[in-house]
């Protein structure tokens, strides 16, 4: 358990280093590469640690709690750091390369703010739905299998990590980031609707199934 805690701290520290670089360094191609690598490494360590814990049965309530806490802060922090970058360098991320050009000002800033809200809402939706299913007799969710996993690759935190490769390309990053937001928003809305329906549907009893 102690080793798992240490690995969680290392993963969080690497992700934090990526956030610090994003906050302090100018938006160059090199900055984007460094940030993407740090984010991907931090996420990869966290994901691998979780897989090992599940396979070996070494997971514990404390470890699972810590993992969820770190995850709940990691992605929103990335979006907030992106917001700071947009505020600090509006002329770099604007299509017209001016402080008041499109998409500049509040129009540009609204994107990471909306992404932060979407991420927080989706995380709460996932965790709360899981807990409610454990405590109440509701219909089981559909799994969707490997096809759904492939279709939902844009929802994976690893995808978010790697788009920062484009951080040094200004408006191209904004375009890719906006596309990722729209794809995530559509998927989250569908996911929330599906969860609401399954939670509102009582589980079938053996007599009903017969």
What do these predicted ranges mean?
Residues 2-5:
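Short, small-residue-biased leader/transition segments that mark boundaries at the very start
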Residues 7-62, 79:
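Membrane-embedded alpha-helical segments that form the functional core of polytopic membrane enzymes
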Residues 7-8, 64, 171-174:
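Short, solvent-exposed positions on alpha-helices
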Residues 10, 34, 38, 66, ...:
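Hydrophobic core positions of alpha-helical segments in small-molecule transporters
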Residues 61-69:
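Membrane-interface alpha-helices at helix entry/exit sites of multi-pass transporters
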Residues 69-210:
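A feature for the membrane-embedded catalytic helix bundles of lipid/isoprenoid biosynthetic enzymes
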């Amino acid at each position: 358990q102690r080793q798992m805690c240490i690995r969680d701290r290392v993963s969080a520290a690497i992700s934090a280093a990526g956030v610090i670089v994003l906050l302090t360094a100018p938006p160059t191609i090199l900055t984007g590469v460094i940030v993407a690598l740090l984010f991907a490494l931090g996420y990869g360590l966290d994901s691998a640690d979780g897989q090992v814990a599940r396979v070996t049965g070494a997971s514990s309530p404390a470890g699972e709690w810590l993992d969820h806490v770190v995850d709940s802060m990691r992605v929103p922090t990335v979006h907030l750091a992106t917001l700071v970058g947009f505020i600090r360098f509006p002329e770099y991320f604007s299509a017209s390369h001016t402080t008041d050009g499109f998409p500049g000002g509040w129009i540009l800033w609204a994107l990471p703010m909306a992404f932060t809200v979407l991420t927080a809402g989706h995380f709460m939706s996932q965790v709360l739905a899981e807990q409610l299913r454990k405590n109440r007799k509701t219909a089981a969710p559909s799994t969707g299998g490997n096809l759904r996993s492939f279709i939902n690759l844009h929802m994976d935190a690893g995808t978010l990590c790697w788009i920062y490769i484009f951080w040094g390309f200004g408006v191209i990053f904004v375009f890719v980031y906006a596309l990722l937001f729209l794809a995530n928003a559509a998927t989250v809305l569908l996911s929330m609707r599906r969860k609401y329906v399954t939670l509102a549907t009582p589980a079938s009893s053996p007599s009903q199934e017969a």
